[in-house]
Amino acid sequence: MKRIFVPLLLLLSLACKEKQKAPLTAQEIVDKSIEDSGGKLYEDHKTFFEFRDRKYVSENNNGKKVLKRIFKVDSVTITDVKTGNDFQRFMNDSLVAVSDSIATKYANSVNSVHYFARLPYGLNDPAVKKELLGKETIEGKRYHKIKVTFDQNGGGEDYDDVYVYWFDVENFKPMYLAYSFHVDGGGQRFRKAYNERYVNGIRFVDYDNYKPKDKDSDILQIGQLFNKEELELLSKIELTDIKVEQD
């Protein structure tokens, strides 16, 4: 009886270990990353920061995400407000008319800055499609590599852009990202996060912003191009005066 019982225990133990080693899905990796970066705090906290001499505010109003950009032109204070798919521009608190084409351009600009500042939170938006590409080594460390595309319905004007994210295999923090785009002649960008800090529980980073030397490079190979020093530094993406408050 003992001879049967002992092997049975060994089989059960091995089965449990195999279950524990089941590979993570793209969704699980993103969920863990969001939890580490702020989790539910994104949903009930207002954030403020400055980027290139403009102020940005993100808040939640009756369940809707409201994104703002505030800056001055001479003595006029301009406030751009994106609520869902709606856009409004105020000049010294007075609403001004903006053509649909210009409103779309301004709304995309506001959304883009907030999107990168709030990462990885936006990666669970309904239009996002995630695909785990495996693991990749960048600068000597291993990362989960996830490709992100968007549904045309709800994916915005740039729904056909392709993004790639690299998440640390140990702590799930997104340390690198890349994307291809089609506006203004198109191109690719690769960003390396640095200067990580948590403000009232929400993670913020700055980025070194690179582009490939070869404009026809494959976006899925851009991590290895970075390893080979085949990217050139374009700019630094730096957020200042960050504040986080409960709504």
Regions found by a protein language model. Give the residues of each.
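Mid-chain, structured segments of secreted extracytoplasmic proteins
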Residues: 69-101
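Flexible, processing/modification-adjacent segments and terminal tails
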Residues: 21-25, 89-157, 181-184, 238, ...
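Extended lipid/amphipathic-ligand handling interfaces
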Residues: 33, 58-60, 194-196
